[in-house]
Amino acid sequence: EILRCLVGSEMCIRDSLSREYQKGINTYANLEKYATVTQDSVKAAQEIGDTADSENTEEAVEEVSEGPQIAVDLDIDYDALTKINEDFVGWIYYAPLELSYPIVRGIDNDYYTHYTFENVRNSSGAIFMDFLNKPDFSHFNTIIYGHNMRNGTMFGSLKKLLNDPSIIKEDPYIYIFTKEKVMMYEICAAYITNDSSHTYDLTQTAEEQADYVKYIRNVATYYWDDPMLEESLTEDTRLITLSTCHGLHSNNRTVIHGVLVASKNR
């Protein structure tokens, strides 16, 4: 009889967790209508090629040759999203992992580990910026957190980049959209660390920033070196750091770094 009760209780817990997971999935599925892809990479590449073949191509060719070009655009209803949550600061998009979520910035780094974008308590939480970062992504390193959900939602898919770096090589560009601009970051490093490592240092001085990128190179499992980050470091260098838990009840974290390679005003 006791065993039957224990089994019944376990089934109830699993059912409750399953319902909560589904609520989280539904919440973010409903938000997708506020951010739709308007231009994919193939179409953008075709447009760049067409421009290069036109009569007035010299300036266009120079622009393309300077580096990677922004090739994805999202039609985002910023006003509607801000009305839902005043902490809304932008949208993150990475096509290979079907990662597409609003980003919030709270008054601490705890609240949005428990509450969704719609401020409903749920284990999915939200994708959120470190509260010490500037909401316009202007810090040298902007840290963005999300839960490692078992169903692969939120930042649960980031571990795929560690397990299969070919995903990065095929498409290394993470996009951040704000009301003011579009920013494209090239994934430059991936690794596992702990929650008290130098990864989470918010650097201030040029010396600290140089030390930080050297640290990344030393600890990274995957490292982009064309060109090497420390060799291309300038006062205009901007990074994003995506962080999620690695393993259940663990202090370890899966970390993905991206370096800003292109941006444009909206």
Regions found by a protein language model. Give the residues of each.
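Single conserved hydrophobic/aromatic residue that forms the stacking wall/gate
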Residues: 1-8, 12
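Solvent-exposed, non-transmembrane regions of membrane-associated and secreted proteins
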Residues: 10, 14-266
